[in-house]
Amino acid sequence: MAELLQAAKAHAPGRESDPGRASIEVVAPLRIDLAGGTLDLWPLWCFHPGALTVNVAISPGVRLRLVVDDRLGGLIRHRAPDGRETLLRPLDRGQNLTAAVGFHFRPEGGVFIDVRDQPTVGSGLGGSSAYAVALARACLFVAGRRVAPTALVDCLKNLEAGVLIAPTGVQDFWPALAGGPLALSFSPGGVRVERLATPTAWLADRLVLIDSGIAHASGMVNWEVYRARVEGSRTTTRALEAIVTAAQRCRDALLAADEEGVGEAVAADWAARRTLAPAVAPPAVEAMIAAGLQAGALAGKACGAGGGGSIAFWTPPLTRAAITAAALQAAPAGARELPVATVGRPPAVRIVASN
């Protein structure tokens, strides 16, 4: 395997150029979940009629390039943003998301995947799902195939669950595929994807995003919630009902461009969410949120499953700088502000180099 990797490096295109071969570039946004997260896990939404999730697509997200290279002998060559390379075989599908998605959509392998941008693991911004979307779109493009969005999301959800060995939802895939802001409504008939007419610039002006530097494992946090609800925990049931109400309020407030209403809904979502499991709101996360609120934020929450990762604040535009400074001061060493550019629709797949 090591010899084959060296041979692939010698013959495959470098990062700076791609002479003689078409290089397909795909960009997939990340997301900030404002309200209703966790409800996208089946069958949790079946227990809570009216369940919906409201999120915003943001960049920078995942950016990768894919080159077909039959000299790889049916393997997948993966290069991470830090330059580390791995050769993947079909047998790796159960432990590696690149292999799971890549070999599903291109069973014959023979591709070089050069990941240019990707969030750190545990960001809470749906990075693994955005990566899966980007890779699937690239593979489908080179194959000349189309898959309906709902079918693609269902497939990627199942592939990701197989790698994580944990329940997975759908809310992270949709912003990566369709942009935002979105309201995802869940019913026995499926998922209804509603694109909200709220201007993306209005949203970006009111969002602050901080990488807390605190590691978390979304799959395990979600499993705690999943198990507690299925086992009939009254605390978890009440919290999820409150999250349903908060998400409905958030959608309505976004459609009305009601700054305070959105803040109240996001705050209500976090107040309920932090009671779902002990791991959702560790003291370091609570300290950052409290500091942001004291500095003038209307609401703050840990993104995704919580427990660490990224902390989002909803705030009047004029207080963004003060909230950022306060949250960083209260954060552990290594925390940093993340840029927030909201995304209406992801860019199309493009050919960036060809002969």
Q: Predicted regions: what is each one?
A:
Residues M1-D33, L39-W42, F47, N55-I58, ...:
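C-terminal nucleotide
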Residues G110-F112:
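Residues at or immediately flanking beta-strands
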Residues L125-P149, L177:
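DPxDG-like acidic metal-binding loop motif
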Residues V121-S123:
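Helix-loop-helix module between adjacent transmembrane segments
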Residues G308-S310:
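Glycine-rich active-site/cofactor-binding loop and its immediate structural neighborhood
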Residues L125, K301-A302:
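A phosphate-binding catalytic loop at a beta-strand-loop-alpha-helix junction
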